[in-house]
Amino acid sequence: MTFPNINPIIFSIGPLAISWYSLSYVIGILLGWFYANKIIEKFKPQITKKNLEDFITYAVIGIIVGGRLGFVLLYNPSRYFSNPIDILKTYEGGMSFHGGALGGIIAAYLFCRKYKINFLSFTDIIAPVVPIGLFLGRIANFINGELYGRITNASFGMIFPNSDLMPRHPSQLYEAFFEGLVLFSILAHATFKHKTLKKCGLNSGIFFTFYGLFRITIEIFREPDIQIGFILDSLTMGQILSVPMLLLGSYLICQSNPK
């Protein structure tokens, strides 16, 4: 299959370029805010809509700064240390989910400490929202023709213009499906059907567990970053960074269901 060559820049106004990647962040945050409000309306937890509104600024800063610094420090430090100005070129892509997650967690912790909100109760409301941004971000990765998969002989293998013109797994779409749609469905079912907000930390644990599991599995089909390659001969950076998430998620689930 031939990659549908889509311009990663939607439009430009002078030096300002609006990319699909940037748009995915904006839409993801807006849809996430809307969905989190619906959860608050339904279950009326101690966290209020005003709390959520106040948190948006924290979230945006934490996600963008954390995501960018995570990519710079973990995936391509030599390039950015040689050309620091490139760190600001977020429209080219280059955001780390793990960095963004850590930035978001730190932002949530600081916010909860300031407003005296239970941290895990707050992240339990945020957890069902995150897959929305993950889905849109992976679609943007696909449009950019980046983070493609390994070479495959399968009929659905896709030739990406920035690769070696060999058919490859469209791993961005695999991630959009599992980390986005499937994980969203799991958390929505847990939240609305099984009332998991009643157990502090359970939603957060479900998110971390399934994200870690999905990411570790899909990395088998994803081409490792060329500047890093394989670690210990067979592992990717994404897999290594996802193991702590899987362990943390399992711990939170166990803690939310004490015997």
Curated annotation (Swiss-Prot):
Functional note: Catalyzes the transfer of the diacylglyceryl group from phosphatidylglycerol to the sulfhydryl group of the N-terminal cysteine of a prolipoprotein, the first step in the formation of mature lipoproteins.
Q: Does the keyword Cell membrane apply?
A: yes
> What class does this enzyme belong to in the EC scheme?
transferase
The alphabetical list of record keywords is: Cell inner membrane, Cell membrane, Membrane, Transferase, Transmembrane, Transmembrane helix
Its pathway, per UniProt, is: Protein modification; lipoprotein biosynthesis (diacylglyceryl transfer)
Q: Could you say which EC number(s) this protein's record lists? A: 2.5.1.145
From which residue to which does any coiled coil extend?
Answer: none
Q: Which residues cross the membrane?
A: 9-29, 55-75, 92-112, 117-137, 172-192, 201-221, 228-248
**Residues reported in the UniProt entry to bind a 1,2-diacyl-sn-glycero-3-phospho-(1'-sn-glycerol):** R138
PROSITE patterns annotated for this entry? LGT
The Gene Ontology terms for molecular function here are:
phosphatidylglycerol-prolipoprotein diacylglyceryl transferase activity
Q: Which domain of life is it from?
A: Bacteria
One GO BP = lipoprotein biosynthetic process
Q: Which Pfam families match?
A: LGT
Which GO CC annotations does the UniProt entry carry?
plasma membrane
| Family affiliation | Belongs to the Lgt family.
Annotated protein name in UniProt: Phosphatidylglycerol--prolipoprotein diacylglyceryl transferase
Q: How does it sit in the membrane?
A: Multi-pass membrane protein
From the Swiss-Prot or TrEMBL record, state where the protein is found. Answer: Cell inner membrane
What InterPro entries is this protein classified in?
Lgt (IPR001640)
